């Protein structure tokens, strides 16, 4: 079974982008409330 590089990258981006977005919002919220 070959690993589809494009599919792997797409999946990684699909997971990492929303995670990074939420992390940035979380950091901004914490720094604001501090």
UniProtKB/Swiss-Prot annotation:
This protein's record includes keyword Membrane: yes
One of the record's GO cellular component terms: photosystem II
GO terms (BP aspect): photosynthesis, light reaction
Signal peptide (residue range): none
Keywords on record: Chloroplast, Membrane, Photosynthesis, Photosystem II, Plastid, Reaction center, Thylakoid, Transmembrane, Transmembrane helix
NCBIfam families: PS_II_psbM
Topology term for the membrane: Single-pass membrane protein
Gene name of the encoded protein: psbM
Role, per record: One of the components of the core complex of photosystem II (PSII). PSII is a light-driven water:plastoquinone oxidoreductase that uses light energy to abstract electrons from H(2)O, generating O(2) and a proton gradient subsequently used for ATP formation. It consists of a core antenna complex that captures photons, and an electron transfer chain that converts photonic excitation into a charge separation. This subunit is found at the monomer-monomer interface.
Subcellular location: Plastid, Chloroplast thylakoid membrane
Protein name stated in the entry: Photosystem II reaction center protein M
Similarity-based family: Belongs to the PsbM family.
Subunit structure: PSII is composed of 1 copy each of membrane proteins PsbA, PsbB, PsbC, PsbD, PsbE, PsbF, PsbH, PsbI, PsbJ, PsbK, PsbL, PsbM, PsbT, PsbX, PsbY, PsbZ, Psb30/Ycf12, at least 3 peripheral proteins of the oxygen-evolving complex and a large number of cofactors. It forms dimeric complexes.
Highest taxon, organism lineage: Eukaryota
Cysteine disulfide partners in this protein: none
